[in-house]
Amino acid sequence: MDLLQQLQNQLNQFPSHTKLLLGFSGGLDSTVLLSLLAKLRKKQPHLSLRAIHIHHGLSQNADNWAIHCRQICQQLDISFLCEKVTINPRKGIEADAREARYQAIANHLQDNEILVTAHHQQDQTETFLLALKRGSGLQGLGAMQIQSVVFNLPIFRPLLHCTRQQLEQYAKTEKLSWIEDESNADNRYDRNFLRNDILPKLRQRWQHIDKAIQRSAQHCFEQQQLINELLNDEFNKIYDKFDRTLSIANFATYSILKQKALLRTWLQHLHILMPSTIQLDNIMRNMIQAQEDRNPTCKLGNQVLRRYQKRLYATPILQDLSHIRLDIQANECINLPDNLGEICLLTKNEHLQVTWQDKQILLPLTQEKIEIRFRYSGKVKLPQGFHQEMKKCWQDHNVPIWQRTRIPLIFYGDTFKSAVGFFDNFE
C-alpha cells in the first residue's frame, strides 16, 4: 500500500468536519507529508488544511527557512502561518524549543482542528531510547502514538509506521525540495548523537531493530493503558472534577505502588510534567506522609503541588501579594495583580456594593480612605459579638493557606472591613 493510500485510510477514521494544521519545518519529513496532504485535498476539496512554521531563531538560516516554507505553501495553495518563538537556553534548547513550539501552535489551533506532524518510525526509535536514557517508566517508554494529546493539543502522526527510506524515495520520485538543518549534524544534542552515531551501528547489527523497538513501545503503551483502566474507578472516587483536587484521606490503606500510580494519574489528568523518581519520592515523603498540621509544597515545572486538609492541589507559581496596598474610591473599578481580575466599588442605596469575580457584598458608605490589601493578621469581630483570630476565620471557611493572600481585603483607613465574599468585620 502506497503512502497516499495509507494516509487516506487513516484520515477516514476522523469525523468529516476535522480540520488539519500541519507542523511544517521545511525538512524532508514534513515536506513529504505536506505533499501527500495536498494531493488528498485535490481528491477531497472539502478537506481543511493549513500549515504552520515555527521560527525558533536558533540558526542564521532561520529566516530563509521561513521564506522557503511560505513559498512551498503558496505553490500548493495552502494557507501558511509563521510564528516566531524565543528560546531560553538555560532551560535546555531541545526541551524549551519543543515547549515553545507547542505553545505557539496552541495559540493558532482552531475548533475541530488537529495538529499533524511528520514523525516516522526512526523518530519513534530515538524517542524510545531517549526515554530509556532518562529512566522513564511505561508512560515514557510508550513513546509516540499515531493519535495522542501533548500539552493539551490533539496530535495526529500518520507517518509513524513509515521508514525514513520510504519518505526519501517518495521525495525523490516527486522531485520535492526541502531544507537541511545544519544543527542535525551537531552531536551535542542527544537525539543527533543517537541518530548519527549509535543507531547506524545498531541497524547494521540488527536490521529490524526499529520495528522491534516500535513493538516494545506499543507494549509499554498498552500496559500503561491497562493500568489506567484498572485504576479508573478508584481514581474517580478520590478526584474532584470541580476543583481538580485529589483526596489522600485513604491513601494509607493503599500500597505504596498504588499511591504512586494514583498520583501519576492525577498529574497526567492535569497535564503536569511527570516527576522524576527522586521528586516522586519527595512528594510521597513530604506531602503524602507529612503530619496533618503541615502544609507542604512541591514545585513541578511551572506548577506547585500543595496539600490542605487531606487534599492535594495544583496551582501556578503564585506572586507574593502580602505587601501590596491599592487605593480605590467609590464608583471605581481597578484590576488586581497576578490575574485576580477586576474589583468594583459602586454606591447603591446608601451602601457600597463590592463586586469581585462571582462575589458581591454590601458595606456601609464611608468618608475614610478605602484600601485593598491582601494580608491581615489581627482579630475579627463576628456578628455574634465576640472576636476571633483572622486565621481561625479562614479555617472556618475552609480557605487553603495560599488562597488567603489572594482574596482582596477591604480596609477603611487602617480598619479591616471585609474579606470579599467570605466574611466581614463587625467592629
UniProtKB/Swiss-Prot annotation:
Keyword Signal found: no
Top enzyme category: ligase
Gene Ontology molecular-function annotations: ATP binding; tRNA(Ile)-lysidine synthase activity
Localisation per UniProt entry: Cytoplasm
A Pfam family per the record: TilS
Protein EC: 6.3.4.19
Gene Ontology biological-process entries: tRNA modification
Domain of life: Bacteria
The keyword Nucleotide-binding is assigned to this record: yes
Residues annotated for ATP binding in this entry: S25, G26, G27, L28, D29, S30
Alphabetical list of InterPro entries matching this protein: Lysidine-tRNA-synth_C, Rossmann-like_a/b/a_fold, TilS/TtcA_N, tRNA_Ile_lys_synt, tRNA_Ile_lys_synt_N, tRNA_Ile_lys_synt_subst-bd
One term under GO cellular component: cytoplasm
Catalyzed chemical reaction(s): cytidine(34) in tRNA(Ile2) + L-lysine + ATP = lysidine(34) in tRNA(Ile2) + AMP + diphosphate + H(+)
SUPFAM superfamilies in the record: Adenine nucleotide alpha hydrolases-like, MesJ substrate recognition domain-like, PheT/TilS domain
Key words, A-Z: ATP-binding, Cytoplasm, Ligase, Nucleotide-binding, tRNA processing
Similarity annotation: Belongs to the tRNA(Ile)-lysidine synthase family.
Notes on the domains: The N-terminal region contains the highly conserved SGGXDS motif, predicted to be a P-loop motif involved in ATP binding.
Protein's job: Ligates lysine onto the cytidine present at position 34 of the AUA codon-specific tRNA(Ile) that contains the anticodon CAU, in an ATP-dependent manner. Cytidine is converted to lysidine, thus changing the amino acid specificity of the tRNA from methionine to isoleucine.
Official protein name in the record: tRNA(Ile)-lysidine synthase
